A protein has these predicted regions:
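Boundary/linker segments flanking structured domains
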Residues: 1-47, 51-157
Length: 157
């Protein structure tokens, strides 16, 4: 199999309320990350990565219970995904990108969670087998996330 290279363009940070107002269906935002204060790891820590397939307002609303218990206000970043061919073509591409499809979003989410070992993600931390041969470039307002993530590095292929 040949490595697939993808780019995630992150926008934000937004407050939780600003994030809930974003239009996911038409915008192409397929991922989100939550960052904030963690009692052990400190400030501006990547706490959670997830998909927006149910809509960002619905998805973030599902986190309201534990977010209400956090020390400080959370920040939300929204990501759109596109196939990467070159930096020249990337610069000319309109952002946010169109949704690349559920299957690739799932693979990329799994690799992101595994590589970043986010504090609050439980699912997908060890379920990364089908995310092989993927490289991700994180661009835009990435926040506390690696600029490049490769299954070759993190999965020791």
């Amino acid at each position: 199999m040949v490595e697939q290279t993808w780019v995630i363009h992150w926008e934000g940070p937004f407050t939780l309320e600003e994030g809930k107002k974003k239009k996911v269906k038409r915008s192409g935002y397929v991922l989100y990350q939550l960052s904030g204060q963690h009692h052990l790891y400190g400030a501006n820590v990547l706490l959670y990565i997830g998909q927006t397939s149910k809509g960002i307002k619905t998805r973030l609303g599902q986190h309201d219970t534990w977010i209400a218990e956090e020390y400080d206000e959370m920040e939300v970043r929204l990501g759109s995904i596109a196939k990467f061919s070159s930096w020249r073509s990337f610069e000319k591409t309109t952002k946010p990108f169109r949704n690349p499809g559920r299957r690739i979003v799932e693979k990329i989410e799994k690799l992101l969670i595994f590589a970043c070992q986010t504090a609050y993600n439980v699912a997908n931390k060890n379920d990364v087998k089908d995310a092989e041969e993927i490289r991700i470039f994180n661009t835009g307002h990435c926040g506390p996330i690696f600029p490049e993530i490769s299954s070759w590095y993190f999965l020791d292929q």
